[in-house]
Swiss-Prot record:
The gene is 5D. Residues 41-120 are annotated as: Disordered. Transmembrane segments: none annotated. InterPro entries: Miracidia_Ag_8I. Residues 45-66 have a biased composition (Acidic residues). This is Immunogenic miracidial antigen 5D. It comes from Schistosoma japonicum (Blood fluke). Belongs to the immunogenic miracidial antigen family.
Amino acid sequence: YNHSHIHTQYFVTYVSFLLLFTSTSLNSPYLSSPVISTGQHIDVGDEDYHDGDDDVDYTDDVDDVDDPHGSPSQLLQGGYQRNRHYGGGTYHSGYYRPNKQHGNGYGGQYPKKYGSGYKH
């Protein structure tokens, strides 16, 4: 029995589990809940007034990038999406909640792109 074949089977199972976890977290009402604001805000323009009542992407604040506040799926899968005003970056696999100005029209319920690793 080929030893490398065992590793291949294990790897395929592992990848399948990751894909299952990703799709589950994207559709879970708990993991895709709105981001909780820390009350801190660095103004990035008049596109987002953080009064707590509107559909604002709090992950676009510079002070939230290294802050452990965000949707649980972001924390579980790693990686915040930095706002385009500050250079953007790679879309990490996981949940991304678009803000009002750059939103995709779905109110932040769906990821910006359906493939992981999409780059601007």
